[in-house]
């Protein structure tokens, strides 16, 4: 699959300024640019494919056209539960930044779910036993998902992508991940 370049959707709200254009090089005809929606399928401002076979196609239409080939992480079966370190911890222990992620649900099967964060206090012993018994999801928050949902996964949060979900993962520039 070829990498596609996207042009953002710009917003010229009253409180906008010139920094996005002057400092970050955003090419926009607006005098003041309030927001630059870099990866957007929102009807009020979609990103657009810039060049190539799909030139001019809105990002949402592109995703509909190419589907799962476009991008993503595909959840299948729970084999591990990632925990992403905070910047403070990762810098101290790993020598690089931690990782916070945002997930956009590209597609999912009916009844698909994501899991993140513990829903009650756990002892170290119970946590270990739940891993051994494959019952860890029983003590994690569960979120039923639908196509188009967006989730912010703060560093330090245990999480898992359930079966039948294809996500686009936008993450902090780090590959430091601990797995349970």
Q: Where are the language model's segments positioned?
A:
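Short solvent-exposed loop/turn micro-motifs enriched in small/polar/acidic residues
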Residues: 98, 135-138, 144, 152-154
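Conserved metal-binding segment of the jelly-roll/cupin
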Residues: 83-84, 144-163, 172
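Extracellular structured ligand-interaction cores
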Residues: 99-102, 158, 164-167
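Double-stranded beta-helix
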Residues: 116-139, 167-180
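Short helix/loop capping segments that flank catalytic or ligand/cofactor-binding pockets
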Residues: 90-92, 113-115, 154, 161-162, ...
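Gly/lys/ser-thr-rich phosphate-binding loops in alpha/beta enzymes
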Residues: 75-77, 140-149
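A generic local secondary-structure boundary/capping motif
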Residues: 92-95, 103, 140-142, 156-158
């Amino acid at each position: 699959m070829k990498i596609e370049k996207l042009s953002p959707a710009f917003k010229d709200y009253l409180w906008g300024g010139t920094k996005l254009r002057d400092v970050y090089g955003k090419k926009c005809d607006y005098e003041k640019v309030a927001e630059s929606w870099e990866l957007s399928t929102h009807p009020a401002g979609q990103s657009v494919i810039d060049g190539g076979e799909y030139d001019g196609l809105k990002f949402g239409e592109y995703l509909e056209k190419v589907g799962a080939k476009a991008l993503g992480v595909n959840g299948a079966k729970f084999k591990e539960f990632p925990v992403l370190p905070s910047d403070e911890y990762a810098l101290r222990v790993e020598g690089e930044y931690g990782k916070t992620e945002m997930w956009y649900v590209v597609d999912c099967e009916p009844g698909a779910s994501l899991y993140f964060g513990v829903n009650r206090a756990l002892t170290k012993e119970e946590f270990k036993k739940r891993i051994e018994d494959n019952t860890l999801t029983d003590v994690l928050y569960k979120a039923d998902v639908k196509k188009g949902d967006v989730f912010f996964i703060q560093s330090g949060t245990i999480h898992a992508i359930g079966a039948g979900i294809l996500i686009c993962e936008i993450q902090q520039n780090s590959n430091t991940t601990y797995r349970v």
